[in-house]
């Protein structure tokens, strides 16, 4: 236990350093100590628990959510933007801008970027703004397309991203769903389809939209040949809560709805997990459950989301943690 005199010296040095902003050399000069001793006493004070730093920056609650998401789910990065009063276009545009900035910070020439469909991916592509040329980057769809809807037209999204990056873009000329498993097997074995999916399998970066299978709020039904009844069946029979690349998973992130998965012209969840860096992009309270399942399944290395979704995800974690303890 330090003596009163030593504790008083600790307090003086800590006040000068943290409260008045003096450098260690100026503190040493004022107190007649060596700079090395001041440094040593500061370190010792931290070890003794005399220093309690509280950070109160604007939007601190968002940064705290990011920290907790990373700690709870073991992801490398989390970016949480404010939820807007207009939960539609304003949030989507802000989310796309944040995701595009994060993506560009990590993009390296020579990367193969695989993308899924969705409004958040479309917003991210639209927000890409760079003067740098990524001529060695390749952009590839990991799922078939539905023509006529920009956010679900994989070939449009890949081409648009390629143009913005000055990168090579591939197109996958196949539907999202085949009529039957046999038809799906036949399509996936076609050279022009197989070659594109093989490139996607060798991607080292993935941009992933995270969708809900709730037919009342999901755009997934609009993107695919599945009906609202199909979605209800998946949710009720196998406990599906979300989808990535049209592949449905339950609350623990386990794949489900195999009879539908067999018809998908795209990567499987297991194949997506082999991509070295996977960025999930999704927002709104309705996406909390799908995001939670995706994080539980280990499908994401990074998450770009909004406050409403982040709070919902952490509430789900707390509820499940209490239930299991």
Descriptions of predicted regions:
Residues 32, 110-117:
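A short, small-residue-rich loop immediately preceding and capping a beta-strand
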Residues 108-112, 134-136, 203, 275, ...:
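A general structural motif
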Residues 4, 43-112, 125-135, 145-157:
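HTH-adjacent hinge/linker in prokaryotic transcriptional regulators
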Residues 115-120, 307:
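Glycine-rich beta-strand-to-loop/alpha-helix junction loops that act as flexible
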């Amino acid at each position: 236990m330090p003596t009163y005199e030593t504790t008083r010296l600790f307090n003086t040095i800590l006040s000068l350093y943290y409260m008045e902003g003096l450098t260690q050399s100026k503190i040493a000069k004022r107190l007649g100590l060596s700079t090395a001793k001041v440094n040593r006493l500061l370190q010792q004070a931290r070890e003794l628990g005399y220093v309690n730093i509280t950070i109160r920056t604007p939007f601190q609650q968002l940064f705290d959510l990011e920290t907790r998401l990373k700690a709870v789910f073991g992801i490398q990065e989390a970016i949480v933007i404010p939820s807007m009063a207009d939960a539609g276009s304003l949030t989507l545009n802000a989310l796309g801008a944040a995701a595009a900035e994060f993506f560009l910070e990590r993009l390296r020439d020579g990367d193969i970027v695989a993308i899924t469909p969705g409004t958040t991916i479309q917003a991210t592509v639209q927000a890409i703004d760079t003067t740098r040329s990524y001529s060695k980057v390749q952009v590839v769809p990991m799922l078939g397309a539905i023509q006529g809807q920009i956010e679900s037209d994989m070939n449009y999204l890949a081409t648009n991203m390629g143009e913005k990056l000055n990168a090579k873009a591939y197109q996958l000329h196949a539907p999202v769903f085949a009529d039957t498993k046999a038809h799906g097997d036949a399509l996936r074995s076609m050279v022009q389809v197989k070659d594109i999916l093989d490139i996607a399998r060798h991607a080292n970066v993935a941009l992933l939209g995270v969708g809900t299978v709730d037919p009342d709020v999901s755009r997934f039904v609009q993107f695919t040949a599945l009906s609202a009844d199909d979605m209800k069946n998946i949710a009720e029979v196998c406990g599906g809560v979300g989808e990535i690349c049209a592949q449905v998973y339950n609350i623990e992130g386990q794949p489900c709805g195999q009879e539908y998965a067999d018809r998908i012209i795209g990567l499987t969840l297991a194949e997506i997990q082999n991509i070295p860096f996977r960025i999930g992009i999704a927002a709104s309270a309705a996406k909390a459950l799908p995001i939670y399942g995706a994080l539980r399944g280990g499908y994401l290395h990074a998450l770009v989301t909004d406050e409403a979704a982040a709070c919902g995800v952490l509430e789900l974690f707390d509820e499940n943690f209490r239930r299991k303890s």
